[in-house]
Amino acid sequence: MTQLFPGPIVRTPGLAELDARARDIFRRVVESYLETGEPVGSRTISKGGVALSPASIRNTMQDLAQLGLLDAPHTSAGRMPTHAGLRMFVDGFLEVGDVAEQEKRAIEARLAVKGRSFEEALAEASSILSGLAGGAGIVVTPVREGGVKHVEFVPLGGGQVLAVMVFEDGQVENRLMRQAPGVTPSALQEASNFLNARLRGRTLTEARTEMGGELDAARRQLNETAARLVEDGLAAWSGGEGDARSLIVRGQANLLADARAREDIDRVRQLFDDLSRRAQLIGLLDDVRDAEGVRIYIGAETRLFSLSGSSVIAAPYMTGRQKVLGAIGVIGPARLNYARVIPLVDYTARVLGRMMDG
């Protein structure tokens, strides 16, 4: 059974504050909106079997709007849930089922392919979620704890050098660097030997703390070309954003699939801008690492997605010994199909964790 872990606490009217009529109409409005993406009018609700006149339904919808649960976009007389309304629906009305057996087998088969690197497996998991959920799949890689085993600089020609760092756990990090033409094989070997002597056995985090001293030593002991290789290599492995982890995003094109109105295009453009803020997104997913189940953020509940009004559904993936490795999830419009996406995220996280054990 999927365990839900809500996002930050936001004050919304409780279910106890709504009578049976209001609860029923509210539920129908939200369900219709999540299905169609369109504002919902009173006639749509009345056709659904509610034994009330359209006028009575409109009055109830107006009451729900005054409570901050529904809103009316300026282009339509219909109503749609606010982010606060979606939060109340998810917490109080949503019925989460299970992933279909066919989809379970597909997820397991795609993640069980042999011969892939760790990062390739994570990217595949992100792609799986983006395809099944209809949003953008996201996954944060674990913090590396294995020591450095080997460092090598490989010439690629055209003024490019591939910096390769192999870890004791078998994982590999490659960084492409630009170098002036004419870098000699001896300079590449000299730089590799220098770093191997000093970084072998250290974690990447430990190696980063020593970078300043290593650069000073390189400038004193190596020729100018080899010293520059060491300096550029250490800078490349520093992670750019100062984090030992990386963020993998797949399926951004899905976010454009049903962007119809200009307002939706503007929202998607803002979401693309949000997704480019990787350090902030990793920080948000760090909160997910502490959750015991699926965590849901809706619109303005996060500062990062407050302008685009997007939702994040994510879960930690962990080993069989409950050691949290990272987080995986889906980002999309606030009208995501929560009942479908929540169990998909939960199941994919569990399969990914089992694969990491194997």
Curated annotation (Swiss-Prot):
The residues the entry assigns to the signal sequence are none
| Pfam hit, one | HrcA
Q: Care to name a GO molecular-function term for this sequence? A: DNA binding
Q: What InterPro entries does the database record attribute to this sequence?
A: GAF-like_dom_sf, HrcA, HrcA_C, WH-like_DNA-bd_sf, WH_DNA-bd_sf, WHTH_transcript_rep_HrcA_IDD
State the Gene Ontology BP annotations.
negative regulation of DNA-templated transcription
What SUPFAM superfamilies does this protein's entry cite?
Answer: GAF domain-like, Winged helix' DNA-binding domain
Sorted alphabetically, the keyword list is: Repressor, Stress response, Transcription, Transcription regulation
Q: What does the protein in this record do?
A: Negative regulator of class I heat shock genes (grpE-dnaK-dnaJ and groELS operons). Prevents heat-shock induction of these operons.
Q: Which family does it belong to?
A: Belongs to the HrcA family.
* UniProt name for this protein: Heat-inducible transcription repressor HrcA
Q: Which organism is it from?
A: Caulobacter vibrioides (strain ATCC 19089 / CIP 103742 / CB 15) (Caulobacter crescentus)
